[in-house]
A protein has these predicted regions:
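Extended, non-catalytic substrate-recognition/exosite surfaces adjacent to catalytic cores, especially
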Residues: 1-194
């Protein structure tokens, strides 16, 4: 098989990074749930599907200060902190505008006790990595997370090609004697019939 594990991991990481960057530009959408506002919070948290390859954890906010928040990782005996300086993407001025005690959020470990806030993207994507010389598929990723969506955007999506089709048209023109600087008449054409 031409698939390469290193390429596959690099493609998955690149796709996730791009999707997360785009999603962050859309801003923060709110915590998953608040334990003080929803009596059924434990069942809702237990039903959350999270891809283990993301290396995320589910955390509860235990203390909110202006520029520092303390968290407790659920189902583990771990506590940590989130620093506000890493959350400029949220569009908020401080933690008091962002989170409250009892909020349940996704986090990812940065260092020993420092964590960063995460959110599941609303957008998705796919990526196909091919060797341009022989056409072999080197890596194929069908989405951000198989757990959150089993639809494979790389093989199952029926997308219009858009500008991706231009090289095929240009190649056909070059094969038929056109040059890159050839002038093409772009005026309406009328043909009289009889």
């Amino acid at each position: 098989t031409p698939l390469n594990g290193k390429y596959q991991i690099a493609a998955l990481n690149a796709l996730r990074s791009g999707i997360e960057s785009y999603d962050k530009r859309q801003g923060w959408r709110d915590p998953i749930i608040n334990v003080y506002k929803d009596k059924d919070w434990q069942n809702k948290v237990n039903n959350l599907k999270i891809d283990k390859t993301l290396n995320w954890e589910i955390a509860k906010i235990i203390r909110v200060e202006k520029y520092l928040t303390e968290i407790k990782i659920l189902n583990k005996n771990l506590k940590g902190k989130i620093l506000f300086e890493s959350l400029k993407w949220t569009g908020k001025k401080n933690f008091n505008e962002l989170l409250s005690d009892g909020d349940i959020i996704f986090v990812q470990k940065k260092s020993s006790d420092i964590w960063t806030l995460k959110q599941l993207p609303k957008v998705n994507g796919g990526i196909v990595v091919m060797d341009p010389f022989n056409g072999k598929v080197k890596a194929l990723v069908g989405g951000y997370s198989f757990i959150s969506s089993e639809f494979n955007r790389a093989t199952q999506a029926k997308r219009q090609p858009g500008s991706a089709f231009k090289p095929i048209v240009y190649a056909a023109a070059l094969e038929n004697g056109f040059l890159p600087n050839s002038l093409i008449l772009d005026a309406p054409f009328v043909s009289k019939q009889g």
